[in-house]
Amino acid sequence: MKYTKNLLYLLFLVSLLITSCGEKQTKQTIINCDSNVNIYYPSGYDKSSHTPSFAILNEPSPVEKVLDSSSLKVSFSEFSDRQIAQVSFGSNVDLYGTGEVMGDLIRNGKTVKLWNTDNYGYGKDNGQRLYQSHPWVLGVGENGKSFGVIADNTWKMEISLGERITFSSEGPAFRVIVIEKDSPQEVMKELGKLTGTIELPPLWSLGFHQCRYSYYPDERVKSLADTMRLKNIPCDVIWMDIDYMQNFKIFTFDSIHFPNPKETNDYLHKNDFKSVWMIDPGIKAEKGFFVYDSGEKINAWVQTRNDSVFLGKVWPGDCVFPDFTQSKVSKWWGGLYENFMAKGVDGVWNDMNEPAVFETVDWTMPDSNKHVGDENIKNDIHLRYHNVYGMMMVESSRNGIIKSNPDKRPFVLTRSNFLGGHRYAATWTGDNNSSMKHLKQSIPMSLNLSLSGQPFNGPDIGGFAGNATPELYAHWIAVGAFYPFSRAHSTKGSINQEPWSFGEEVETVSREALQRRYRLLPYLYTLFWESANTGMPVMRPVFFNNPAEKYLRTEQENFLLGSDLLIVPKWSENGQIPAGNWRNISINGEKSQNHKYHPDVLIRPGAIVPLCNPIVSTNSFSLDTITLIVSLDSNLSAKGILYSDLGEGYGYQDGEFSL
């Protein structure tokens, strides 16, 4: 009896110890690198489980092994088969980043799930698990001193942002990279050095994009283009969703609705439009279908745990999915674009690439599916490669498009991505709702994506799901004209959401809003050049004007476009404006102060902002005549930067630009 009591007491102590501690601490190795970057390796780190790094393009240069000299403290542990990394930081630190998420700009107190998912209307997990994964946190402390933390890990993971930053992964032990700088701007630049920056996009992609699920047949596409020009509404791009395909089979064209896609694209080009066409990863499993047959010959498909080909239902029915961990598959996929682009296609839209799979519990393929890999990427299960599936797809697409059109800059838009994927594609924030809530949410969402290294982003203007009201659309297009990526999009079965669909007042608001964007193209293009060279975001939180000012840290309705323009939406309530004489400016003769919809645009004291002449297409873009808006500071001085090149091709890499 005494033995039993002692045993029970011992078990109680053990359970108490497990409850209070819960985690098995592990040792670590710290590598000090240039530029105030430290890399932390847990004792159980297996390089083969994380090589190559999908996030890091340029490995930081080690200086020497040192004791932890960082103001942050990193620790590793194991708990219930999960690998955990925790980062402790000081008081009064505001946290940002974590990629594409719903909620406030400041992420303190939030938990984010990193498992890319098709999240229609952001209904799953309250929008804390969306289409992309960015294992990255930006911290801003007192006096603006800042840090950034990367969990270099693709496996399924959660980020909890409490008194400590906690990364909890279902995969093997992973390394953590910490950046410490004097300002968030310097942290973003260092992130750009590590992950790479965007390539300078074609100028036309900075224009306005009109999309719908779906514009068909081809005569409707032509009519849309004609109406845009007739109504003098600035627009550069018209988009084709899946209904252009033959029975939803990728790289095909419907023989009735789009019998001659080359002629359709030629018509758009003649009227100064570009076209973007959708390509999904799901391939109809059908003998005789050329995409399936050619992939079958090289064993291109993701496999099940039992080594059979995985079949999942998407739009065409039973589909197979390319295994992009194999170099031969990536090359094969890229080669499919040659004939496709030869039909006059200008850009590509990679959708459904989480990958989305219908009629499954989690709307994707099983964790246990197998990726074959090769000498470059190790074979492993889908749990490891799920979050980078879309990233691998868009890299393969981009490479194929470049090979097809070597003299043109590629444009790819993706729904799914991962930290570092900005190198290959722009992104939008997925299937939002036509609601004032989602309009307001679009600002912190786009800002946190921007603060996670993805500068070329924006939501569906007007909202994708549901029906926009005239008032909602007017508010959205008025603000949406200032998103880095400006595209209107709506779902099948919803009302038409073209600028003229809501009556004369909204049509006028839309025209004026887009005229503002197009006159700002010299400034906007310069911001993209800056981002391509430094990693700085195009759309920035207001606190970037003065990171030491605590009162600016929570502002999530107003936002900066670059460093010189502050956008203040009409629905902004008690929005914070930085100190100094920020002046309200007119870009195209509009008077925003008393307007119901147009946001106020304020210029920073000491800034010079260039404008081009009014145009409706970037094909007419010219700097032969420019207008300068000059705002003198208290010292009666001002300065600005203007970058210019041909807007297409790669001559700028050989010095063919003006600065």
Regions found by a protein language model. Name each.
Residues 1-8:
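Bacterial N-terminal signal peptides that target proteins for export
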Residues 18-20:
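C-terminal motif of bacterial Sec signal peptides marking the signal peptidase cleavage site
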Residues 24-205, 212-213, 218, 225-227, ...:
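Catalytic and substrate-binding clefts that recognize carbohydrates or anionic sugar/phosphate headgroups
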Residues 76, 140, 150-153, 161, ...:
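Glycine-rich, histidine-containing beta strand-loop boundary motifs that form or position
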Residues 124, 398-410, 417-428, 441-445, ...:
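Catalytic core of carbohydrate-active enzymes
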Residues 126-127, 201, 211-259:
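A conserved hydrophobic secondary-structure block that centers on an alpha-helix together
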Residues 136, 187, 191, 228, ...:
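A residue-level signal for conserved active-site and pocket-lining positions in enzyme catalytic cores
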Residues 234-510, 545-546:
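Aromatic- and carboxylate-enriched substrate-binding clefts and catalytic-loop regions
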